[in-house]
């Protein structure tokens, strides 16, 4: 989800989608984690959490991953704000090739050794372009801090809770774990975007 030129938000708005289900209710190796291959097309205006979840579910269904409850890995802020980590179930999560990317919520956020450019695939099982690829699509929208919680500093880290495509900012991570920003190797909290538009 970024471009090097004007670096508005991202080349194509990318989200992380995770299936949320009770533990033991999924088949081992069934896809339950992916980076969206395409965004809805209106910058960071995803239609709020419901719109983002619907977009993830639509892409998963088209790729044969239906029958699950899909949630975009996004936090929101303000009154009634939610933490991304609280929306995604308890794991484990597998990519489209059946590789486990994280066993549980703590592993996803703290050790996160299974999260690499090679394992954070699209719903189609394709590798997503990273920092040194053309186009660079390594930024992924999260609106979250390193531990998957929402920001409480009163600043806009979610492009108006995923309803704005203009002014504002969204916290993004780097799916390839490289690049610039305060925490360049973070998959979910590398830096804020310059605005909420789409390049």
Language model features by range: what are they?
Residues 1-2, 108:
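Intrinsically disordered, low-complexity regions of eukaryotic proteins
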Residues 10-20:
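Bacterial N-terminal signal peptides
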Residues 23-199:
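Secreted/extracellular ectodomain signature
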